[in-house]
């Protein structure tokens, strides 16, 4: 155990209101590619850049191509929770963790047993008809081809926040409230480049901020503790 991990262990042992703020790096150890790392989605070949395909405009104007990309690149139904997801769920069961705030849409925190999860960018597990509002699960999207349609004829849209779309106010309020109450904020697996989500950590009022990410991020200087190891590997030692 490194000195930094040992310090983090002391912090987590003493904390009573941990909030975890996570991004794509949390799920890479479950085999889900992140967006911006080498080998991530933004470095893969496609007819259009991912930022374009995953926009509201593209979804509306070219739904066939959107869903082809979405099924091929955004859905990983075989992924399982890793050590990071499991440790966070364990802390919640012990009453040490207030909430998980995640930029991920994979539902792996819930699969690990976490209950209080604020999904800033939505979830692939929720899909709704744009016409009548009927709910469809992930299996329905996986087992249809082309543009998925409801019995009423409406397009079934994944409940994920696309570029050009606003975040859910209720989710934001819950995340802000949790972060403001935290006595320890652990930020993991995110480059903090996606706004407005990254701005939420400004609501943290405590003095113990730990940052776990494989590459340096803009907030390194503000963090009391910076660890550049895989997050599952780090949390499993705590």
List each language-model region with its residue ranges:
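Conserved catalytic core of sirtuin-type NAD+-dependent deacylases
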Residues: 1-238
């Amino acid at each position: 155990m490194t000195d930094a991990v040992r310090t983090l262990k002391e912090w987590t042992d003493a904390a009573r209101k941990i909030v975890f703020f996570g991004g794509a790096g949390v799920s890479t150890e479950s085999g889900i590619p992140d967006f911006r790392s080498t080998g991530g989605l933004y470095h893969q070949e496609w007819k259009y850049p991912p930022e374009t395909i995953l926009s509201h405009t593209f979804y509306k104007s070219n739904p066939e191509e959107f869903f082809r990309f979405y099924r091929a690149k955004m859905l990983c139904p075989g992924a399982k929770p890793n050590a990071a997801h499991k440790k966070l769920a364990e802390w919640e069961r012990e009453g040490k963790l207030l909430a998980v705030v995640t930029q991920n849409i994979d539902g792996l925190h819930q699969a690990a047993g976490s209950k209080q999860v604020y999904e800033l960018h939505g979830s692939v597990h929720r899909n709704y008809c744009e016409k009548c509002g009927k709910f469809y699960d992930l299996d329905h999207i996986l087992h249809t081809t082309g543009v998925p349609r409801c019995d009423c004829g409406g397009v079934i849209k994944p409940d994920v926040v696309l570029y050009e779309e606003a975040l859910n106010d209720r989710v934001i309020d819950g995340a802000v409230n949790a972060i403001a109450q935290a006595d320890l904020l652990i930020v993991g697996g995110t480059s903090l480049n996606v706004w407005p989500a990254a701005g939420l950590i400004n609501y943290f009022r405590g003095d113990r901020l730990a940052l776990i990410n494989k590459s340096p991020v803009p907030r390194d200087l503000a963090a009391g503790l910076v660890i550049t190891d895989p997050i599952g590997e780090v949390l499993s030692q705590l």
